[in-house]
């Protein structure tokens, strides 16, 4: 492509030098999108059309196919600004040049891992003088109509913990771009995630309560399966009893999400990271610490959830009555029963969930993400389901011990046993399989929980004015 400089008058500005690529004598007086599509490579033209669709107001979207040249100039200006931001973010030494290591490090900070050889291959496609470094002039000439926002879009498209809610709040928080912080989009994403979690948990509450019953009562000599458990719940308290404990489970979403997000941002500052996003290991450390802080604060609500899920008809009048009863009969310490295994469970859950999700994400990006960072609904749901399932499988024994410790005083004939004592007791009387009681309903709720939370998240996000990119 030959480079051509034009001086084009743009509204409310002086004459602006606009540099773009001429393809086979591309004329300056283009009249229609059809003409442009003939002269430009299909990938570059589709990128321009996506940009145009995003920038147009709703009432202007049904246009007549005519291309306004002034509008095309604005596109080139916006594109060059995006390129400049990406170049500066990679040029950490402020040397005015970017090498293969800079590309590797920048992508690693975004959770995308490529080899030095792959980075050199990318570099060679832009390097015109064979120095294996590129300056700003070489960088901005790398096809003007290619999507410059591809790297930041990885963060925007691959949200994980904000979108998917499987009932366990142990995931590492998602990263937000500088743009999302400045525009206030971050809180819209969090509100959307909170609303999605509320709907998702409510829809899967019967399976969640069944899991708790199987974890606690499955050790009392009677085997409890899915159908017998559901039948027992309905027989004892009617259909409404299937949702016992769901109220407090939904209420705790807001404070826990807010605490985790604020703690995560503060920990990032303490860690002294100057980058927009953290690397995988840093995210794991910061996310785990944020999870510990949030869980420590709202843990009494976790105990209340378990007690309310196990309650019999007429035992408590509501959440406050249950809290008063526990405080009166067992004391304040009862609200932190099972705290240690719960905290220990954060590490395997958060670590494996993050590692699996990032591995799946990187695999997809390396194979299919060269042209577009948007993975599509199916890929996102599949990655979220697999990573959440792996995380829960690894931390499930600790979750079961936590639940039994929370329920000790509410189970007749149950003695107060420590975490290690309870582990030994389960292994002795039930064997290794005893550590996985209730796993079936827990896994059965993952796919519907992930699917429901994604659909509701997208709907609320759209209502709050967050457009899908």
Curated annotation (Swiss-Prot):
Residue span(s) of domain EF-hand: 47-80, 78-113, 114-149
PROSITE patterns linked to this entry: EF_HAND_2, SOLCAR
Family affiliation: Belongs to the mitochondrial carrier (TC 2.A.29) family.
GO terms under biological process: ADP transport; ATP transport
Transmembrane portions of the chain: 190-207, 245-264, 288-301, 338-357, 381-398, 438-457
Organism of provenance: Danio rerio (Zebrafish)
Residues reported in the UniProt entry to bind Ca(2+): 64, 66, 71
Solcar repeat intervals: 184-270, 278-363, 375-463
Protein name: Calcium-binding mitochondrial carrier protein SCaMC-2-A
Cited Pfam families: Mito_carr
InterPro entries: EF-hand-dom_pair, EF_hand_dom, GDC-like, Mit_carrier, Mitochondrial_sb/sol_carrier, Mt_carrier_dom_sf
Keywords: Calcium, Membrane, Metal-binding, Mitochondrion, Mitochondrion inner membrane, Repeat, Transmembrane, Transmembrane helix, Transport
PANTHER family to which the protein is assigned, alphabetical: SOLUTE CARRIER FAMILY 25
Mitochondrial matrix topological segments: 208-244, 302-337, 399-437
Mitochondrial intermembrane topological segments: 1-189, 265-287, 358-380, 458-469
Membrane topology: Multi-pass membrane protein
Lineage: superkingdom: Eukaryota
Keyword Mitochondrion applies: yes
Keyword Transferase: no
Cellular-component GO terms for this entry: mitochondrial inner membrane
Cellular localization per UniProt: Mitochondrion inner membrane
Function: Calcium-dependent mitochondrial solute carrier.
GO molecular function: ATP transmembrane transporter activity; calcium ion binding
């Amino acid at each position: 492509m030959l480079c051509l400089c034009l001086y084009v008058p743009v509204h409310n500005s002086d004459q602006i030098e606009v540099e773009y690529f001429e393809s086979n004598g591309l004329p300056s007086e283009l009249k229609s999108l059809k003409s442009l599509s003939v002269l430009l490579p299909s990938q570059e033209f589709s990128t321009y059309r996506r940009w145009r669709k995003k920038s147009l107001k709703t009432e202007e979207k049904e246009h007549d196919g005519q291309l306004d040249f002034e509008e095309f100039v604005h596109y080139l200006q916006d594109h060059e600004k995006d390129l400049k931001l990406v170049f500066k973010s990679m040029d950490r030494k402020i040397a005015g040049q970017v090498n293969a290591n800079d590309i590797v490090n920048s992508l690693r900070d975004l959770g995308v891992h490529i080899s030095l050889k792959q980075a050199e291959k990318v570099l060679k496609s832009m390097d015109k003088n064979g120095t294996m470094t590129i300056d700003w002039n070489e960088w901005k000439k790398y096809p003007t109509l290619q999507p410059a926002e591809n790297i930041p879009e990885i963060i925007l498209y691959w949200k994980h913990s904000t979108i998917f809610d499987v009932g366990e709040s142990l995931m590492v928080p998602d990263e937000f771009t500088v743009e999302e912080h400045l525009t206030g989009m971050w809180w819209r994403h969090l509100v959307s995630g909170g609303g999605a979690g509320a709907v998702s948990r409510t829809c899967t509450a019967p399976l969640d309560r069944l899991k708790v019953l199987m974890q606690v009562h499955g050790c009392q000599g009677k085997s409890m399966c899915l159908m017998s458990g559901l039948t027992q719940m309905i027989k004892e308290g009617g259909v409404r009893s299937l949702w016992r404990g769901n109220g407090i489970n939904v209420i705790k979403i807001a404070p826990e999400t807010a605490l985790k997000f604020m703690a995560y941002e503060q920990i990032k500052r303490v860690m002294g990271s100057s980058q927009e996003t953290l690397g995988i290991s840093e995210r794991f450390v910061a996310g785990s610490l944020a999870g510990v802080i949030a869980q420590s604060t709202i843990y009494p609500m976790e105990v209340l959830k378990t007690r309310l899920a196990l309650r019999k008809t007429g035992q408590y009048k509501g959440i406050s009555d249950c809290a008063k009863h526990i405080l009166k009969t067992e004391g304040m310490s009862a609200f932190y029963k099972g705290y240690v295994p719960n905290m220990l469970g954060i590490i395997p859950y958060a670590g494996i969930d993050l590692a699996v999700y990032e591995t799946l994400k990187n695999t997809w990006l390396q194979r299919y993400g060269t042209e577009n960072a948007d993975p599509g609904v199916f890929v996102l749901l599949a990655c979220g389901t697999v990573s959440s399932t792996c995380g829960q499988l690894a931390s499930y024994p600790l979750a079961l011990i936590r639940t039994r410790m929370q329920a000790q005083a509410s189970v007749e004939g149950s003695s107060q046993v420590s975490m290690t004592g309870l582990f030994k007791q389960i292994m002795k009387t039930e064997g290794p399989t005893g550590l996985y009681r209730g796993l079936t309903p827990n896994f059965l709720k993952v796919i519907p929980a992930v699917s429901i939370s994604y659909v509701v998240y997208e709907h609320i996000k759209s209502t709050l004015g967050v457009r899908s990119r």
